[in-house]
Swiss-Prot record:
The protein, known as: Cytochrome c biogenesis ATP-binding export protein CcmA
Enzyme Commission designation: 7.6.2.5
Entry annotated with the keyword Hydrolase: no
Pfam families according to UniProt: ABC_tran
A GO CC term assigned to this protein in UniProt: plasma membrane
Family: Belongs to the ABC transporter superfamily. CcmA exporter (TC 3.A.1.107) family.
Record-annotated ABC transporter domain positions: 2-206
UniProt: ATP binding residues: 34-41
GO terms of molecular function: ABC-type heme transporter activity; ATP binding; ATP hydrolysis activity
Lineage: Bacteria, Pseudomonadati, Pseudomonadota, Gammaproteobacteria, Enterobacterales
GO BP terms in the entry: cytochrome complex assembly
CDD domains reported in the protein's UniProt record: ABC_CcmA_heme_exporter
């Protein structure tokens, strides 16, 4: 279980959120909401261990993540708002790099899940923004991490792709995994199982 305890985040002397606390357990899908500038990306980076809060701490299974970095890196997958893939490599080469323990068959299957069959050997820099995003999202079919932290994973993805990715989120949660995401897109109607946390300058405003 992930526990955020009394997190405060400030940028350029402006408090983005203060005393923010919540938990994310096995099987949870949590959407972080809020207006632009509320600190959604900053929160995800703090949760992933890429930034430090002004105060507060992150616990994973009741232990501070800073005390178990190696375990945390295995248990957590972070995908930022940029695709985060290597433009000079192909989709196949990217996934081999990020998931060296996976077979080519597994990688081809993952690329098929995100509709990139036929693009395995293309240069990523020559793909569209949506295709580059899907190369990154193919990692969701390969990762063994229990917690996924995803910043705008649905950007440049069409409606059918959104539904498939949300289905993968649900499958991951059904296996006891957890998902934390931000998105500006409306989620499919059937995804009423998604918990929502809304950020304001005072921290968590609403959670349901």
């Amino acid at each position: 279980m992930l526990e955020a305890k009394e997190l405060t985040c400030a940028r350029d002397e402006r408090v983005l959120f203060s005393q923010l606390s919540f938990t994310v357990g096995a099987g949870n899908i949590v959407q972080i909401e809020g207006p632009n500038g509320a600190g959604k990306t900053s929160l995800l980076r703090i949760l992933a261990g890429l930034s430090r809060p002004e105060s507060g701490e992150i616990l994973w299974n009741q232990t501070a993540v800073g005390r178990q970095r190696d375990i945390w890196q295995r248990e957590m997958l972070y995908l930022g708002h940029l695709p985060g893939v290597k433009g000079v490599l192909s989709p196949l080469e990217n996934l081999r790099f990020f998931h060296p323990d996976c077979s080519d068959e597994q990688i081809f299957d993952a690329l098929d899940e995100v509709d990139l069959t036929g693009y395995e050997d293309a240069i990523v820099a020559q793909l569209s923004a949506g295709q580059q995003r899907r190369v990154a999202l193919a990692r969701l079919w390969l990762s063994q991490a229990r917690l996924w932290i995803l910043d705008e994973p649905l950007t440049a993805i069409d409606k059918a792709g959104v539904e498939k990715i949300m289905s993968q989120f649900a499958s991951h949660a059904g296996r006891g995994g957890s998902v934390i995401l931000t998105t500006h897109q409306d989620l499919p109607d059937q995804q009423d199982v998604v918990r929502k946390i809304r950020l304001t300058a005072e921290g968590r405003d609403e959670c349901w």
